[in-house]
Amino acid sequence: MLSAARLIAPAARSAIFSNAAVVRPLAAVSTQTQLVPAAPAQLSAVRSFQTTSVTKDIDSAAKFIGAGAATVGVAGSGAGIGTVFGSLIIGYARNPSLKQQLFSYAILGFALSEAMGLFCLMMAFLLLFAF
């Protein structure tokens, strides 16, 4: 396989760097033909195809699916808050003298978990009402 690549690579390089239009890469040939502007009738046909009721229904269905998927993060936030305060209770039961430090860490964990839930909820509302 490696020997075949060694034989083909010089031929491919010479074909790419050649000036003949026949051996140019396909991308170089197609960019020259794209300079011709398209007819206005073709553009309006494409534009009317994109605004059908089927397309609008698909867009709204995708919007609802995305909002539902973004709402799943709110449930994860609730589970995270429960885990944080459950760990606070376990830590306080093991060492009551660290009550103040454990509580400050629990509040920090609560805030971070709640922020992630609010970001997920915000994305769901943005998908529903802004797009």
UniProtKB/Swiss-Prot annotation:
Topology versus the membrane: Multi-pass membrane protein
Gene Ontology cellular-component annotations: mitochondrial membrane; proton-transporting ATP synthase complex; proton-transporting two-sector ATPase complex, proton-transporting domain
Sorted UniProt keywords: CF(0), Hydrogen ion transport, Ion transport, Lipid-binding, Membrane, Methylation, Mitochondrion, Transit peptide, Transmembrane, Transmembrane helix, Transport
Modification after translation: Trimethylated by ATPSCKMT at Lys-99. Methylation may be required for proper incorporation of the C subunit into the ATP synthase complex and mitochondrial respiration.
Site (Reversibly protonated during proton transport): E114
BP-aspect Gene Ontology terms: proton motive force-driven ATP synthesis
GO molecular function: lipid binding; proton transmembrane transporter activity
Residues the record lists as N6,N6,N6-trimethyllysine modifications: K99
Localization of this protein: Mitochondrion membrane
Classification via InterPro entries: ATP_synth_F0_csu, ATP_synth_F0_csu_DDCD_BS, ATP_synth_F0_csu_sf, ATPase_proteolipid_c-like_dom, F/V-ATP_Csub_sf
Superkingdom of the source species: Eukaryota
Transit peptide feature, positions: 1-56
Residues passing through the membrane, by range: 72-92, 107-127
Family: Belongs to the ATPase C chain family.
Subunit structure: F-type ATPases have 2 components, CF(1) - the catalytic core - and CF(0) - the membrane proton channel. CF(1) has five subunits: alpha(3), beta(3), gamma(1), delta(1), epsilon(1). CF(0) has three main subunits: a, b and c.
Function: Mitochondrial membrane ATP synthase (F(1)F(0) ATP synthase or Complex V) produces ATP from ADP in the presence of a proton gradient across the membrane which is generated by electron transport complexes of the respiratory chain. F-type ATPases consist of two structural domains, F(1) - containing the extramembraneous catalytic core and F(0) - containing the membrane proton channel, linked together by a central stalk and a peripheral stalk. During catalysis, ATP synthesis in the catalytic domain of F(1) is coupled via a rotary mechanism of the central stalk subunits to proton translocation.
Protein name, UniProt field: ATP synthase lipid-binding protein, mitochondrial
